[in-house]
Each structure stands twice: as structure tokens, then as C-alpha cells.
């Protein structure tokens, strides 16, 4: 995984600190929360619209154990889902 993608994936405490800093700078932080198991055009559209509503887009990914979309889900484990989402240019942090 590229370093710039790794840098977007933060622990919860690190994410809270980033939000605090951005808010102090007067930036509007927006969040999208979901499974993000399969990145399809609807997800891209949703994230684009979310990014347009603020300065910083944070995406939080539901943990594998908490996914309730059926017995075969998630298709991809949470580490891969995090990597996929953080690879998107409109996402600032995961």
C-alpha cells in the first residue's frame, strides 16, 4: 500500500485530533459512515457529494463483526475496505 494511502488511515484518537485541528482552522469536517464493501458508482457519487459539503471528508468503515447485510457479507475484510476507501482522492481520512 502506498504511503499516502496509509497516512489517511488513522486510529480513533488520531482521527479525533485531526478533526479538532481542522475545526480550529475554521474548516468544515463532514463524515460518511458505512460498510463500503463494494465501491460502485452510487458510493462514488455519495462521497463526491459529501466532499462538496465540507472541507475535510472523513469516512468511517463499519467493522466486520458489526456488518448486518447477510451471512456472506462483508465480501472484503475491513482492512481491505479501509484501503479501498482511503485510495479515493475525495477521502481525506478513514
For the regions a language model picked out, list residue spans one by one.
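Nucleotidyltransferase catalytic core that binds NTPs
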Residues: 1-94
Amino acid at each position: 500500500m502506498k504511503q499516502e494511502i496509509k497516512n489517511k488511515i488513522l486510529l480513533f484518537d488520531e482521527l479525533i485530533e485531526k478533526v479538532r485541528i481542522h475545526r480550529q482552522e475554521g474548516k468544515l469536517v463532514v463524515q460518511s459512515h458505512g460498510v463500503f464493501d463494494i465501491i460502485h458508482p452510487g458510493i462514488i457519487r455519495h462521497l463526491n457529494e459529501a466532499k462538496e459539503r465540507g472541507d475535510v471528508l472523513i469516512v468511517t468503515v463499519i467493522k466486520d463483526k458489526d456488518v448486518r447485510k447477510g451471512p456472506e457479507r462483508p465480501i472484503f475484510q475491513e482492512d481491505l475496505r479501509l484501503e479501498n476507501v482511503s485510495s479515493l482522492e475525495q477521502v481525506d481520512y478513514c
